[in-house]
Amino acid sequence: MKPIVKWSGGKTDELKRFEDYIPSDCSTFIEPFAGGAATFFHVGNQFENKVLSDVHVELVALYRAIANGKSQAIYDFMKSHANDEKTYYEVRSWKPEDYVDVASRFYYLRKTCFRGMMRYNKNGGFNVPFGRYKTYNFEDIINEEYYNILKDTIILEKSFDYIFETYNDSSNFVFLDPPYDSVFTDYGYCSFGKEEHVRLSNFFKTTKNKCLMVIGATDFIRELYDGYIHTEYEKKYRFKLHSGRVGDEINTTHLVIKNY
């Protein structure tokens, strides 16, 4: 299964680079930084128990709605809301309270916003412009495979601190795909800087959980996880600009880090 929504830094194209390091002797899969949850959807069904967590309220609402059998309601919302600029900004300005409405709004915006970007203003409002894409696919939302895996998953809106404090057993496999070490630390819906990275590394080094992390390489991260870096690989990115032109290729190095 591919991710339900596009997510910056998603690992769909990199799974083959690290999936062989996923342990086969663990019964519980845990992902504290869910995002698009590419790894969860790829290997989650191999585990008896599954825990998916993120601090992004709308993302968690989407996963919970699907798990609770509300996919059809989201699909109906998509069918009844046009892919045009007027409708887009009406939906973007809407502030629903019911979690299924929150999930529907979020899914619509993820499918129709520019380049699937995730950007918020200082007040926490989503401020990505309309994408102007002629076609987009939302049929996947009613794919029963998503319901089947999510209905058997504990879905949490919790920080990584909570996850490590709550789950601490050698039978747990924790996949970590945290925000990268970057000068950009405020994501609108959360902040994640060097202080958080240090805290995460302390959990990583002291927990009983078997942890596998994939993260962009920086001197800070290399120093933080010295002795735990198993391998590394090159990753190339190329973004499509608003003008339609393809941007310059960006080369990065990703580290595969594990504590077992």
From Swiss-Prot:
Reactions that this protein is recorded to catalyse: a 2'-deoxyadenosine in DNA + S-adenosyl-L-methionine = an N(6)-methyl-2'-deoxyadenosine in DNA + S-adenosyl-L-homocysteine + H(+)
Residues the entry annotates as binding S-adenosyl-L-methionine: 7, 11, 54, 177
One GO term (biological process): mismatch repair
Any matching Pfam family: MethyltransfD12
Keywords: DNA-binding, Methyltransferase, Restriction system, S-adenosyl-L-methionine, Transferase
GO MF term set: S-adenosyl-L-methionine binding; sequence-specific DNA binding; site-specific DNA-methyltransferase (adenine-specific) activity
EC identifiers of the protein: 2.1.1.72
SUPFAM superfamilies found in the cross-reference section: S-adenosyl-L-methionine-dependent methyltransferases
Top-rank taxon, per record: Viruses
Classification via InterPro entries: Ade_MeTrfase_dom_2, DNA_methylase_N6_adenine_CS, M_m6A_EcoRV, MeTrfase_D12, SAM-dependent_MTases_sf
Protein family: Belongs to the N(4)/N(6)-methyltransferase family.
Name by which UniProt lists this protein: Type II methyltransferase M.CviBI
UniProt organism field: Paramecium bursaria Chlorella virus NC1A
Underlying gene: CVIBIM
